[in-house]
């Protein structure tokens, strides 16, 4: 019994003498935190990119909604372009009265080219969208139908 008490006393004394982390333990903790931080930065970068693409698609859908408002008060008999930014053609309608300035989520200013083409189709209309920003675009080569808009259609801008 006395021998067992001595062992317990020595174990307790040894535990009392331990005062903190060794340098190796501290280094392991720092390395683990660094790995976790690196993984988090990569994951957050993807989330930010996707949210910018979602914002661009939302802008395109907002332009289509503005075009629908336009056709409600201005019936269209031939294909009409409702322009929100860029160089206006002689027959283009002004869409800026329906939507405030659309900001490019990938740049610092407005989109360089933004319009909706309204095409009569029997007793309804078809809407196609082009939205070009500083780095990304939707329908840069060919305008995209409004019912197919998704973030998968946001591509890198060409011709820079």
Task: Give the location of each predicted region.
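Aliphatic-rich helix starts adjacent to a transmembrane/signal segment
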Residues: 44-64
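Flexible interhelical turns and helix-capping residues at alpha-helix boundaries
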Residues: 16, 37, 49-52
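N-terminal alpha-helical signal peptides/signal-anchor transmembrane segments
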Residues: 60-77
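N-terminal leader/signal peptides at the extreme start of proteins
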Residues: 1-19
